[in-house]
């Protein structure tokens, strides 16, 4: 069923952050940083995949994402909902159900046998496709999925995520340059504010996280592993 009420953006962001904290999807570890896919260190990590195990929370967040899209993109803006492999697939299925639209998913790369396809499900030329993922950091992986969708002759001008890092200023511009608008529910800044309000972490940890969020590149550069070749 399509939601008919439209909560304020600020309330959606606050409640989304609260739910992520409640299920312990948020991890802050400034003194033993996580390693991102890029190889760079980060004191923050978020596991949106956990959401699928919490029916009330996942339903609420999908309602939030639905009303965000209806308000910002339009009520008749899409013909197909595509999930990005792997984390985006369950959320795309839930969004397709709410929007009463066909659902497909996009592989990261062709599987190498059979049809050797990147698109699974039925996607046809001219369809307006919404790309759904769990989160985005710098937007890079979204561009690959968008290109695969467009290669079918469909269009893709919107991507929707639950969580957007919101700390890399080039992200929005990169997506816009590719003709894609990003829709999201909350950012690290929303999570930090809610973490402070809930006393979920100690003050020292939150101060270090804020330092990272304010200038992630400098924080990472100061903590990158030393290059073994540098001393040769």
Swiss-Prot record:
Enzyme class: transferase
Entry binding sites for 5-phospho-alpha-D-ribose 1-diphosphate: 107-108, 111, 133-141
GO MF, one example: magnesium ion binding
Keywords: Glycosyltransferase, Magnesium, Pyrimidine biosynthesis, Transferase
CDD domains: PRTases_typeI
Keyword Cell membrane: no
Pathway(s) where this gene product acts: Pyrimidine metabolism; UMP biosynthesis via de novo pathway; UMP from orotate: step 1/2
GO biological process, one term: pyrimidine nucleobase biosynthetic process
EC number from the UniProt entry: 2.4.2.10
Residues binding orotate: 137
InterPro entries linked: OPRT, PRibTrfase_dom, PRTase-like
Cofactor needs: Mg(2+)
The UniProt record lists the keyword Glycosyltransferase: yes
The reaction(s) this protein catalyses: orotidine 5'-phosphate + diphosphate = orotate + 5-phospho-alpha-D-ribose 1-diphosphate
Pfam families referenced in this protein's UniProt entry, alphabetically: Pribosyltran
Quaternary state and interactors: Homodimer.
Function: Catalyzes the transfer of a ribosyl phosphate group from 5-phosphoribose 1-diphosphate to orotate, leading to the formation of orotidine monophosphate (OMP).
Family: Belongs to the purine/pyrimidine phosphoribosyltransferase family. PyrE subfamily.
Name this polypeptide is given: Orotate phosphoribosyltransferase
């Amino acid at each position: 069923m399509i939601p008919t009420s439209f909560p304020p953006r600020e309330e959606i962001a606050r409640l989304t952050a609260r739910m992520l904290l409640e299920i312990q999807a948020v991890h802050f570890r400034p003194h033993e940083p996580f390693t991102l896919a890029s190889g760079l260190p980060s004191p923050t990590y978020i596991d949106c995949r956990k959401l699928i195990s919490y029916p009330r929370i996942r339903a609420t967040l999908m309602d939030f994402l639905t009303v965000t899209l209806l308000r910002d993109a339009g009520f008749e803006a899409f013909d197909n909902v595509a999930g990005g492999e792997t984390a985006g697939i369950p959320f795309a299925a839930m969004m397709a159900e709410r929007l009463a639209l066909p659902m497909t998913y996009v592989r990261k790369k062709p599987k190498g046998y059979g049809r050797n396809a990147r698109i699974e499900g039925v996607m046809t030329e001219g369809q307006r496709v919404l790309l759904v993922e769990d989160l985005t950091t710098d937007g890079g992986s979204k561009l690959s999925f968008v290109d695969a969708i467009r290669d079918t002759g469909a269009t893709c001008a919107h991507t929707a995520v639950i969580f957007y890092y919101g700390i890399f200023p080039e992200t929005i511009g990169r997506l816009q340059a590719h003709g894609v608008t990003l829709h999201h529910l909350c950012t690290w800044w929303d999570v930090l504010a809610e973490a402070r309000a809930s006393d979920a972490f100690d003050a020292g940890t939150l101060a270090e996280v804020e330092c990272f969020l304010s200038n992630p590149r400098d924080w990472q550069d100061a903590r990158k592993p030393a290059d073994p070749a540098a001393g040769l």
